[in-house]
């Protein structure tokens, strides 16, 4: 499914070159996870998607136990998700990061390490109760995602002619 935000993801990857993480914020069920996973499949050699709604405690605990030992953090993530990570060619996605704010605050150290790119997704991530007691990383670039507009809806229906007629 084609979305306008996809081009912004490509631009972020080109411009950031690993110097910032991307936080995609938007309402529930607008396709954040879908578009990020499509972007990962098309633009990286490998990716890991950590869905914090479903991630077991052992994955969440890694961010407390190994933040000062990133080699082991990446080793555990790679083995748990059975995905080989390639330096500067892999993306790690923190899906629904508001559920586990500790992972969001870890972005500062992960980006500084420079091995991989990071995208965080979430709804309501800027609500005070979801950012309480964490340091919001300055290494985050924000992108707002909205529901499909009419043109995107027509793309999804494979109806490109109607938009031309309207314009």
List the predicted regions and their residue ranges:
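Phosphate-binding site recognition
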Residues: 1-167
């Amino acid at each position: 499914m084609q979305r306008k935000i996809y081009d912004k993801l490509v631009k972020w990857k080109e411009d950031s070159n690993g110097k910032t993480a991307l936080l995609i914020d938007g309402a529930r069920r607008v396709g954040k996870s879908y578009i990020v996973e499509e972007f990962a499949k098309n633009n990286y050699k490998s990716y890991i998607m950590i869905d914090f709604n479903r991630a077991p405690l052992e994955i969440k605990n890694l961010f407390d136990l190994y933040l000062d030992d990133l080699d082991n953090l990446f080793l555990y993530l790679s083995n748990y998700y059975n995905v080989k990570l390639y330096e500067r060619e892999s993306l790690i996605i923190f899906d629904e990061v508001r559920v586990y704010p500790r992972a969001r605050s870890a972005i500062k150290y992960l980006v500084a390490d420079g091995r991989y790119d990071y995208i965080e997704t979430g709804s309501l991530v800027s609500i005070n109760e979801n950012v309480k007691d964490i340091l919001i990383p300055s290494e985050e670039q924000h992108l707002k995602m909205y529901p499909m507009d009419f043109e995107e809806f027509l793309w999804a229906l494979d109806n490109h002619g109607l938009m031309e007629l309207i314009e």
